[in-house]
Amino acid sequence: MSQTIDLTLDGLSCGHCVKRVKESLEQRPDVELADVTVTEAHVTGTASADALIETIKQAGYGATLSHPKAKPLTESSIPSEALAAVPHELPVATADEESQQLLLSGMSCASCVTRVQHALQSVPGVTQARVNLAERTALVMGSASAADLVQAVEKAGYGAEAIEDDIKRRERQQETAIATMKRFRWQAIVALAVGIPVMVWGMIGDNMMVTGDNRSLWLAIGLITLAVMVFAGGHFYRNAWKSLLNGTATMDTLVALGTGVAWLYSMSVNLWPQWFPMEARHLYYEASAMIIGLINLGHMLEARARQRSSKALEKLLDLTPPTARVVTEDGEKSVPLADVQPGMLLRLTTGDRVPVDGEITQGEAWLDEAMLTGEPIPQQKGEGDSVHAGTVVQDGSILFRASAVGSHTTLSRIIRMVRQAQSSKPEIGQLADKISAVFVPVVVAIALFSAAIWYFFGPAPQIVYTLVIATTVLIIACPCALGLATPMSIISGVGRAAEFGVLVRDADALQRASTLDTLVFDKTGTLTEGKPQVVAVKTFNGVDEAQALRLAAALEQGSSHPLAHAILEKAGDDKLPQVNGFRTLRGLGVSGEAEGHQLLLGNQALLNEQHVATDDMTAEITAQASQGSTPVLLAIDGKAAALLAVRDPLRSDSIAALERLHNAGYRLVMLTGDNPTTANAIAKEAGIDEVIAGVLPDGKADAIKRLQSQGRQVAMVGDGINDAPALAQADVGIAMGGGSDVAIETAAITLMRHSLMGVADALAISRATLRNMKQNLLGAFIYNSIGIPVAAGILWPFTGTLLNPVVAGAAMALSSITVVSNANRLLRFKPKA
């Protein structure tokens, strides 16, 4: 018997999260219908609550059983026409309390990431945990306490620290990174200072074979090497031991095994040479020291490169000034930023950085918003305009009232989105995760198998060849490069996008954006300025223009439609009559009664439905529509009275931006509620390939579905509340800056500047990021696929040579450095204009 189960959801942050959960539930044979929002799910079918919760967890989110109480429907609870298009299926901003970021230490490779992630996800209350090897951080969603999270990480054998304040956390992260680089540097110097002279001496003078004459000298070198292994390489052995206790294996395990076996063999030969044949008395002390030195050197260079990749987020954090100038009855005073509260009056002068969001109450100024929006040209701001934290006053002086402070400012929201995106993992990275989970055990197995083959079938002295093969295979294998390949590209790509005013919700959005072939644009406010103007008024049946404007404006007083503002503005300051019986006719227009007249105002379909003859207007309707204007028709007492031609001009950069997108190979589609004639005229001017006209607000998502059913990968670009369902339905939703909060929260990508050039920039950066990610993954796979067989001696039958363990150590270090350096190229990426 079917039942409906109500679940409370955790960890969903956008329309695609909703879509993913819905699809996961509806794939179950025992689920008939799943109604999913960002906070809850109502599932009808025969499945049990536990089974549904498990399905949602497998999709990467959290769920608990809920028992909501029914609420009586009142008139005020009925949604408005504008909101009816997006009833309850849209996400809201995730509150700060729902996520915590931890600083991690002790991680060295992708296997460590898997271990820490499992430890965090096992903590009660955690709905999602994202561990980032490149940043050495973990972003944890859910209600678990910081103490529980830190304890779980420490129990897994790693270090963790929870710091709430973004700036303090970043400072701590920088301190740790600098200290780590210094530590790796001196460890590398110490190890190489011992390893290089011994290796050179062996190549030039002594042949590294122990004899009765040099036995004591080699014993001293062995003890010095042991000291190097303890002080310069101790972290490898400590971490390997912790991993062993936790039943896992990491890169440190490979290094510890390789260098440890080489040293133990050498010391055994040194102490008991009589146990070994003469040709097997070769010593490998220099290999242990050199390997530790080279890998530490690689870690130092890698840490330095990783620090460069985090500069974008550091720049955003540095935008907030430490103090603000507050204006009170007693005058002006400088106060710490933490003391500023909403409603306070603040002053800004030339050169000041805006401390919080607010609205200008007095004065004018030019503000540089480049770091926030990517817009290089300073913007003039005056009374009533908004200012945002992080922007800079280039010239002028203003008073403004604080409206959002602390974590509620636009800048804080951007930092939060960038941080979450940098911690996310795309679908392509999941392959690397699966391989990383079994990488180290497989490498150890390959090393043992290869050593066995050389021991039983190799040339004499077998024990020497066995040792070299096992050590080289263990050392050359590099899970570190595999673990860094995806997160380094994401950190650099998301950071670079932020510098262009492009905010990416998660790494999946970047991956999806790189595969798009069709871009759908909402017309009003996206392709156009969103500020329509009445460009012509034509009257009929003896009605004069002033009367037509006055009555039309009176009706539009009750409408929130963008065209209504244009008509009200055209009417000016004239006193407007009172309207009775006002009604909004969805998709048609409005109606009402004023000054004893029955009024209709809307499109031609409205007048036709009300049996108002429009024959006299037909020629003018066609003429205005063909010029790109929207004809708004007025009928008085059942007769056609006037035509108001309203035109919303294209944005200044729309044509250039669309041409740029055309050249990049995208098919461009315009989605609008306008009549086909008007829509086609605008599309022709803008260079649009395809027009979908006459679409009602709640039909936009269906239009996107139809395009997707044709096999297209679709992005929707919009800015209004009624665009939100389409933004969620599209493969990638792109919200224009300055748009509604609902649209921005639904979109996968948000443009901070209201310019279509941002769309081209966003798509170019997404393609570059995915290309970089593939290069890193391919490089890591090729390195290991070639390096491990070569280390195992596959070239011996053809060349008669084996790879030296020292060369293997250098190659391992170089592989990680190469991945990080390649990802850092994204920090210099510039989209082609």
From Swiss-Prot:
> Which GO biological-process labels does this protein carry?
copper ion homeostasis; viral translational frameshifting
> CDD domains given for it?
HMA (cd00371), P-type_ATPase_Cu-like (cd02094)
Could you say which residues bind Mg(2+) here?
719, 723
**Molecular-function GO term, any one:** P-type divalent copper transporter activity
Q: What is the superkingdom listed in this entry's lineage?
A: Bacteria
* SS bond partners: none
Q: Which residues bind Cu(+) 1?
A: 14, 17
Q: Which GO terms describe its cellular component?
A: cytoplasm; plasma membrane
Q: Does the keyword Repeat apply?
A: yes
The family classification in the record reads:
Belongs to the cation transport ATPase (P-type) (TC 3.A.3) family. Type IB subfamily.
Q: What is this protein called?
A: Copper-exporting P-type ATPase
The scientific name of the source species is Salmonella typhi
